[in-house]
Amino acid sequence: MAVVISIHRPYVTLTISKNRNPLKPHRQFNESCLRFDHLPRNTKNQLRCLSAKSTPSKPDPASPQDGEELESVGVKAALAMLRFYKREISPVLPRSCRYVPTCSEYSMEAYKKYGVLKGTVLTTWRLCRCNPLGGSGFDPPRWFGESGIKLREGDEEEEDNYDDEDQRKI
């Protein structure tokens, strides 16, 4: 990950005054880093601390249940990196993925479906398999041991009604 600093635009910091006025941008032209000296002490401590969402005691009925994956900060960060890769790096490189969907699309689907941890494991496993000696073809993201085809609720599995081995092969 790289940090890009533009030399064409000056830094902008937010000045917080004690008179409770709205925040006003203040341009600092000669500073090379962000400073928080002008902020009150309690605001400095708030900036240093990370806040976490607390789980409500009464869950909202509209909120996702256990089976549904809510996009976390990690998923959003991973998807942002993948979008950057697809937009900036991938067009420069020759096509080399042997699978459908491509490795970057596979990774995006895995992160959306399984979350950060399982998505990272599946992406790593896919990148290890995507080489000239590996396989090729259709390979959707699915967790280990998970079946590839999910039946709808109303459908039943097809029964084998063949009498002979020869009829099965046809």
Curated annotation (Swiss-Prot):
Q: Which InterPro entries match?
A: Membr_insert_effic_factor_YidD
Source organism, top-level taxon: Eukaryota
Acidic residues: which segments have biased composition?
154-170
- Region spans: Disordered: 49-70, 147-170
Identify the SMART domains for this entry: Haemolytic
Name the family. Answer: Belongs to the UPF0161 family.
Q: What is this protein called?
A: UPF0161 protein At3g09310
| Organism this protein belongs to | Arabidopsis thaliana (Mouse-ear cress)
Q: Top-down, what is the taxonomic lineage of the species of origin? A: Eukaryota, Viridiplantae, Streptophyta, Embryophyta, Tracheophyta
